Amino acid sequence: MSLTQEDKAGIISQFGGVQQNTGKAEVQVALFSRRITDLTGHLQQHPKDKHSRRGLLMLVGKRKKVLNYLKNVDIERYRTVIAELDLRK
């Protein structure tokens, strides 16, 4: 299932503060995480879908890059994002 405009707006307002703040690292990580969750569910139902698996791996890589940037720039923002999205233990 793709991300609807309402879902995307909710994620942006939750992590970015205002609707126009889509470039914030926290917003990008949250949107990537939501898309990764949706693709993971799709791949559980369709295990032979190799194209979607590649897209999933690309999204995971993008999220990893943004998280590394956030960790290097501001460790506290990184920790709050990790805690809110429940990404790492």
Curated annotation (Swiss-Prot):
UniProt-listed PROSITE patterns: RIBOSOMAL_S15
Matching Gene3D superfamilies: 6.10.250.3130, S15/NS1, RNA-binding
Pfam families in UniProt: Ribosomal_S15
Keyword Ribonucleoprotein: yes
Alphabetical UniProt keywords: Ribonucleoprotein, Ribosomal protein, RNA-binding, rRNA-binding
InterPro entries assigned to the protein according to its UniProt record, in alphabetical order: Ribosomal_uS15, Ribosomal_uS15_bac-type, uS15_NS1_RNA-bd_sf
Cellular component GO terms, alphabetical: cytosolic small ribosomal subunit
GO BP terms: translation
One of the record's GO molecular function terms: structural constituent of ribosome
Family (UniProt): Belongs to the universal ribosomal protein uS15 family.
Function according to Swiss-Prot or TrEMBL: One of the primary rRNA binding proteins, it binds directly to 16S rRNA where it helps nucleate assembly of the platform of the 30S subunit by binding and bridging several RNA helices of the 16S rRNA.
Oligomeric and partner information: Part of the 30S ribosomal subunit. Forms a bridge to the 50S subunit in the 70S ribosome, contacting the 23S rRNA.
Identification of the protein by name: Small ribosomal subunit protein uS15
Annotated organism of origin: Chlorobium phaeobacteroides (strain DSM 266 / SMG 266 / 2430)
